[in-house]
UniProtKB/Swiss-Prot annotation:
UniProt keywords, alphabetically: ATP-binding, Chaperone, Cytoplasm, Isomerase, Nucleotide-binding
Residues reported to bind ATP: 29-32, 86-90, 413, 477-479, 493
EC number per UniProt: 5.6.1.7
GO molecular function annotation: ATP binding; ATP-dependent protein folding chaperone; isomerase activity; unfolded protein binding
Entry's family note: Belongs to the chaperonin (HSP60) family.
Highest taxon above the source species: Bacteria
Keyword match Ribosomal protein: no
Function: Together with its co-chaperonin GroES, plays an essential role in assisting protein folding. The GroEL-GroES system forms a nano-cage that allows encapsulation of the non-native substrate proteins and provides a physical environment optimized to promote and accelerate protein folding.
Designated name of the protein: Chaperonin GroEL
GO CC annotation, single: cytoplasm
Gene: groEL
Length: 543
């Protein structure tokens, strides 16, 4: 495959054109008066969104050099989304500003390596200032504010704050599409897994078609039970106690299942059987989680335990268990609190060590089931198009909220960046080109406020000047068109999002400035295949 090569200024300008095309498409969404972008889809209705990373991911440019520039800035948005879950538009905007200001200086003959040094120095100082000015999230009200600003909707803010309050910081909040027009919150208390009863004859409430067991014993095993003789000794002990039983096993079939059903129908004793959740190694870990939560043991040949030798003290217990056709929910397991805390710590360490996003997600689900709970935000809307747009906004707001809980909040609307300029201005260096790098960041830090103002139809320079000359904490509320104390008014951003956006933008932009040569593949021009000749329409053989 033949390659095309560009050098120096020509290569940087070609890539900058791509950066500008992507950033200009993304930055129209910034701020409370930001607009939406419509993305064409090959199948179905177009997607309308104001989510920076979703827009960036859709952009592929025809010109190969421009596309390389666009892909570099796309990485800024993607990385910020991965780390903080929000702030992708701000990150893209900052990258564009640093590249634009940096290229002016490189074109004028400045050394890009020294400029890069100045950029790093200024970014480190700004990040330190952002961390210093952050305030810990304090209660439900702060959480609602963060979510409302991210989603540009106070209702969504309240919904997410309710969810966080109910499941705690360790809980899992998922976002699903609803079949109705309303957006609702559904909270599952206790540990729930997606396995239901093995026979409908096991239900205790025929109207709701579910089984509810109060203070039951819980037998956990990774074995398949098909012979009733294996569990007969423990069943006799439970009948004598007058208790109910939940069996969680790999499977229960044949004679064993039939005997349990017959005894339930006769009223001898109540037993509900469900399959163990998960598969393979994950199933073993989930059974162990349930055992720790309920204070029981997993009966497994791996640890030398046989079903026929089970005693009552090996069984778990819980305040209540609800089993439907699809799900089992264990409420208030009677396990030892210290052992549960140790298990939670172990899972948390595994989350930190794993690099797989899928494994991380599954571990977080297990952590939530042990430590908090699970909340589901069911997103409703009148049309499919509105539903997708609303779902994306709620996912962003949720990510912003989690980031705020981790590292606290700072004044929103780009105010935190303007406040960081004061510290950056104090920096100095003997080398003039390093000072240029510092000046580039000083100018780039104004860009978010400038763009928020532009999207509101206002002149950014005037607003920036007014904020700089105001006391600390004062910023510009673009929605109301007034200067106000951002923290007091609840216009806040997560410190983690603000920090990550700047760090990722500077990382990619400073690398961009040191580019001297671009190598791209020349696309093949395949000639259209010649049309096949039309066959004769002979009438041979006809009389």
């Amino acid at each position: 495959m033949a390659k095309s090569i560009l050098f120096g200024e020509e290569s940087r300008r070609a890539m900058q054109a791509g950066v500008d095309k992507l950033a200009n498409a993304v930055k129209v969404t910034l701020g409370p008066k930001g607009r939406n972008v419509v993305l064409d889809k090959k199948f179905g209705a177009p997607l309308i969104t104001n989510d920076g990373v979703t827009i960036a991911k859709e952009i592929e440019l025809e010109d190969m050099y421009e596309n390389m520039g666009a892909q570099l800035v796309k990485e800024v948005a993607t990385k910020t989304n991965d780390v903080a879950g929000d702030g992708t538009t701000t990150a893209t905007l900052l990258a564009q500003a640093i590249i634009r200001e940096g290229l002016k200086n490189v074109t004028a003959g400045a050394n890009p390596m020294l400029i890069r040094k100045g950029i790093k120095l200024a970014v480190d100082t700004a990040v330190e200032q952002i961390k210093k000015s952050s305030k810990q999230v304090d209660g439900k009200e702060d959480i609602a504010r963060v979510a409302a600003i991210s989603a540009a909707d106070p209702e969504i803010g309240k919904l997410i704050a309710d969810a966080m309050e109910k499941v705690g910081n360790e809980g899992v909040i998922t976002v699903e599409e609803s079949n109705t027009m309303a957006t609702e919150l559904e909270v599952v208390e206790g540990m729930q897994f997606d396995r239901g009863y093995l026979s409908p004859y096991m239900v205790t409430d025929a109207e709701k078609m579910e089984a509810v067991l109060e203070n039951p014993y819980i037998l956990l095993t990774d074995k398949k039970i098909s012979n009733i003789q294996e569990i007969l000794p423990i069943l006799e002990q439970i009948v004598q106690q007058g208790k109910k039983l939940l069996i969680i096993a790999e499977d229960i079939e044949g004679e064993a299942l039939a005997t349990l059903v017959v005894n339930k129908l006769r009223g001898t004793f109540t037993c509900v059987a469900v399959k163990a959740p998960g598969f393979g190694d994950r199933r073993k870990e989930m059974l162990r989680d349930i055992a720790i939560l309920t204070g029981g043991e997993v009966i497994s040949e791996e640890v030398g335990r046989e079903l026929k030798d089970v005693t009552l003290d090996m069984l778990g217990t819980a305040e209540s268990v609800k089993i439907s056709k699809e799900n089992t929910t264990i409420v208030n397991g009677k396990g030892n609190k210290e052992v549960i805390a140790d298990r939670v710590g172990q899972i948390r360490r595994q989350i930190e060590e794993t690099s797989s996003e899928f494994d991380k997600e599954k571990l977080q689900e297990r952590l939530a089931k042990l430590a908090g709970g699970v909340a589901v935000v069911k997103v409703g809307a009148a049309t499919e198009t509105e539903l997708k747009e609303r779902k994306l906004r709620i996912e962003d707001a949720l990510a912003a909220t989690k980031a705020a809980v981790e590292e606290g909040i700072v004044a929103g609307g780009g105010t935190a960046y303007l406040r960081a300029i004061k510290e950056v201005e104090k920096l100095t260096d003997d080398n003039a080109e390093v000072r240029l790098g510092i000046a580039i960041i000083r100018r780039a830090l104004e860009e978010p406020v400038r763009q928020i103002a532009a999207n509101a139809g206002l002149e950014g320079s005037v607003i920036i000047d007014k904020i700089k000359n105001s006391e600390d904490g004062i910023g510009f509320d673009a929605l109301e068109g007034e200067y106000t104390n951002m923290m007091q008014k609840g216009i806040v951003d997560p410190a983690k999002v603000t920090r990550s956006a700047l760090q990722n933008a500077a990382s990619v932009a400073s690398t961009f400035l040191t580019t001297e040569c671009v190598v791209a593949e020349i696309p093949e021009k395949n000639p259209m295949p010649a049309a096949p000749g039309m066959g004769g329409m002979g009438m041979d053989g006809m009389y």
